[in-house]
Amino acid sequence: MSRKPIIAGNWKMNKNPQEARAFVEAVASKLPSTDLVDVAVAAPAVDLVTTIEAAKDSVLKVAAQNCYFENTGAFTGETSPKVLAEMGADYVVIGHSERRDYFHETDEDINKKAKAIFANGLTPIVCCGESLETYEAGKAVEFVGAQVSAALAGLSAEQVASLVLAYEPIWAIGTGKSATQDDAQNMCKAVRDVVAADFGQEVADKVRVQYGGSVKPENVKDYMACPDVDGALVGGASLEAGSFLALLDFLN
């Protein structure tokens, strides 16, 4: 079945509110129809209000880069999924390797966040991916499969069909190394196969799987030609309006 592509930029800890607004103003009027592709940017928490406000009359969707799994409480420094929904966010990125690595987030944390995100009417973009050691040991499929199963445990089939999975090999994030087209296809298919095993083929056929890891305007078309790659989660190339728009040239 045909799945609508989704291109999402992850700004990470970059841009102040003025820069975020300028970016949205530069790209908003130039984006293709939502019939063709969903386009989103994941802004830092400090930029979300500005980014959502600037994007509100356009087709650009806005993601948060993280949230907590409780709506309110004594959780200093955390972001409420309930408030993200009230602000007008569309997506929340969870399970990014930087969160797992630097902030010691576990599969259980990510699963709780996925449930909280759905409970508040938002859509999770659930990241998964292996280290270079795991890849070179030939254990990538097994490792990433376990991440996906754990992250989605206890969700309904309907919820899983509607979310986004982002496969990002850790060795390709910000390193300039990128997975080959075959690597990307094989791993995104492996991710989809886990969904099929856990939730059935119909759900697996609906869920969108992105590839991430040094995706650039020069290579996005190759990745998007893969039958099991439904989009891209893009870091560095999403920081400039020109290169972000150029990522959408794969449609032509």
From Swiss-Prot:
Biological process terms in GO annotation: gluconeogenesis; glyceraldehyde-3-phosphate biosynthetic process; glycerol catabolic process; glycolytic process
CDD domains (UniProt xref): TIM
Gene encoding the protein: tpiA
Domain of life, per lineage: Bacteria
Residue sites binding substrate per the record: 10-12, 174, 214, 235-236
PANTHER family cross-referenced by the UniProt entry: TRIOSEPHOSPHATE ISOMERASE (PTHR21139:SF42)
Active site: 96 (electrophile), 168 (proton acceptor)
GO cellular component: cytosol
Cysteine disulfide links: none
Organism expressing this protein natively: Streptococcus pyogenes serotype M6 (strain ATCC BAA-946 / MGAS10394)
Main location: cytoplasm
Enzyme Commission designation: 5.3.1.1
Function recorded in the entry: Involved in the gluconeogenesis. Catalyzes stereospecifically the conversion of dihydroxyacetone phosphate (DHAP) to D-glyceraldehyde-3-phosphate (G3P).
Homology family: Belongs to the triosephosphate isomerase family.
Protein name, UniProt field: Triosephosphate isomerase
GO molecular function: triose-phosphate isomerase activity
The protein's annotated pathway: Carbohydrate biosynthesis; gluconeogenesis; Carbohydrate degradation; glycolysis; D-glyceraldehyde 3-phosphate from glycerone phosphate: step 1/1
Cited PROSITE patterns: TIM_1, TIM_2
Reaction catalysed by this enzyme: D-glyceraldehyde 3-phosphate = dihydroxyacetone phosphate
Keywords recorded for this protein, A-Z: Cytoplasm, Gluconeogenesis, Glycolysis, Isomerase
Subunit-level organization: Homodimer.
